[in-house]
Amino acid sequence: MAKKNDSLGNRMKGYESVSRHFLTRRMPAIIRLDGKAFHTFTKGMKKPFDPIMTQAMQSTMKYLCENIQGCVLGYTQSDEITLVLTDYATLQTDAWFGNNIQKMVSVSASMATLAFNQAFSAISAEWINQQIHQFPTMGTETTREVHTYIVKRNTALFDSR
């Protein structure tokens, strides 16, 4: 039973510590991030490697390698990213989140989600802009109307191949 003067935060940390697990220090840690339902997400994309998807995954991996402490190697294939982390570059090197598995997994997944969404959005927007500039501007009235609409609304477009 918690004492009356315990703060809510301290009690919650106590509950969390029961299931807290740590990796062994001074050993490489491998994090594998796998896309959820990417078979549905990639429906309609070029097989086997859509250039927009590939570029977004590479950009995501690069972001993770640059922003996760101790990351020495990143590898991406399909909808998976593998990262190798070390905490033995020097004797004073600390492990990312003290090798707390729950923290490493949850934060790396959220970082990957953020980076992928930003990269995919930017790369898709660039592709859409390229398509708009290839769209014929001369010709029928309908063609001109479609072009005008796309140019004015291009921030709301999404590559739905």
Regions found by a protein language model. Give the residues of each.
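Regulatory and interdomain segments flanking nucleotide-handling catalytic cores
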Residues: 1-161
